[in-house]
Amino acid sequence: YGSSPRQNATTGWTLRDTEGNILQSGQWNSKEIPVGNNFTLGEVAAPLTTVTTPQRLILEVSVNNRKNDWNIWVYPTVRQAIPHENKICMTDRLDTITLNTLEKGATVLLSLKKGSLSKELGGDIQIGFSSIFWNTAWTAKQAPHTLGILCNPAHPALSEFPTEYHSDYQWWDAMSHSGAIEFSKLSPKIHPIVRVIDDWFTNRPLALLFEARVGKGKILVSGIDFWQDMDKRPEARQLLYSLKKYMNSPAFHPDTELKREQIQQLL
């Protein structure tokens, strides 16, 4: 968008980790860069075989002394097995068998299928990866109704899913397959692992992930649908792995106690 094309521009790229270590880099042949959009500088090809842990990488592109960068997330295709993973009961329903097993001491991961959350607990709230336009009061409750997420990046449930305290593009998939749970109607003592930020006009306490004790058992409730098209959702697979690893650890020790009847209100 300058006054004329750039002649013989020096262009290149680097791929680095969050510590500043350069994993790969390259340069493109000098060329004329036209004014405007929709032209190609070159291709980026970077083997990722050296990346063995889930992490955020930064792709930086330079044109002469000007730079821009983008976050990308890399997850291993082969993960360390979770001991006794089969002891985690993963379900999308709360039938009598599941509830009885939970009360007797089972560990349950309740992943709500998108659209199954009861209206009373947030089923009519439409999450969007992008924020609302202006506010819902001025747009007749036009979707989306929320403003991203808030979480503690150091929470052990997210140890295998690198994140900052706010949403970035690794959360796009989860937020596109989820519902916002109005957890205060279950218990004001719940402290969500991942909180959904509501529109300031309604300001409801909303959760994407939370945990609780029910009887002698422990439950992690996910507003994220971990059922649909999982073969096409690498971010969802990685987040699910992180949650299961947490649930199989001593760190999974919910403080909030809920009754059977309270949990049943979710569906």
Q: Over which residues does each language-model region extend?
A:
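Solvent-exposed, conformationally flexible loop/turn segments
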Residues: I33-F39
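Catalytic beta-strand/loop cores that center a nucleophilic Ser/Cys/Thr
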Residues: E43, T49, S116-K119, S130, ...
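Edge beta-strands of extracellular beta-sandwich domains
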Residues: R66-T77
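Short alpha-beta junction capping motif
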Residues: E85-N135, R213-K216, L220-S222, L243
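Short amphipathic C-terminal alpha-helix that caps PH/PH-like domains
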Residues: E235-M247
